Amino acid sequence: MKRVAFIFSSAPHGSAAGREGLDALLATSALTDEIGVFFVGDGVFQLLPDQRPGAVLARDYIATFKLLSLYDIDQCWLCADSARERGLDPATPWVVDVECLAPDALRARLHEFDVILRF
C-alpha cells in the first residue's frame, strides 16, 4: 500500500478545509497504516488547545484530532518555524503529540510518502 501524507496548511475556522482533511484522514486510516500528518503554515493553529469555534458560529472539530492515536496514526509533525512565525512556542501543549521539526527536516520526512493530500 502507498504511504499517504496529509498536510494541514489552513487555519481551522476560516473554511471547511481542516474539517474535511480530518475526515479524509480518518477514512484513509481504514485503508492503510502508512499515514503521516504534517502541520505547516496556518495549519499549526489546528492543534491549539482551548479553541472556542462557537464564538464564530463554527463547528468544534478540533477535539477529534485527539482520536488520531485510537486510529493508530502516530506520525505527526509540526513546522517549528511556522509556529514561531505566528507567535507560538513549538513547545506548546498541542492537542496531539507532534514532533516539531525545522523546514528542511520536515521536507525530508514528506519525501518519504507516495501520495500527498493538502488541506
Swiss-Prot record:
GO terms for biological process: tRNA processing. Pfam families: DsrE (PF02635). The keyword Kinase does not apply. One of its GO terms (cellular component) is cytoplasm. Keywords: Cytoplasm, tRNA processing. InterPro entries: DsrEFH-like (IPR027396), Sulphur_relay_DsrE/F-like (IPR003787), Sulphur_relay_TusC (IPR037450), Sulphur_relay_TusC/DsrF (IPR017462). It is found in: Cytoplasm. Its main location: cytoplasm. Part of a sulfur-relay system required for 2-thiolation of 5-methylaminomethyl-2-thiouridine (mnm(5)s(2)U) at tRNA wobble positions. Belongs to the DsrF/TusC family. HAMAP family: Thiourid_synth_C. Heterohexamer, formed by a dimer of trimers. The hexameric TusBCD complex contains 2 copies each of TusB, TusC and TusD. The TusBCD complex interacts with TusE. This is Protein TusC. It comes from Klebsiella pneumoniae (strain 342).
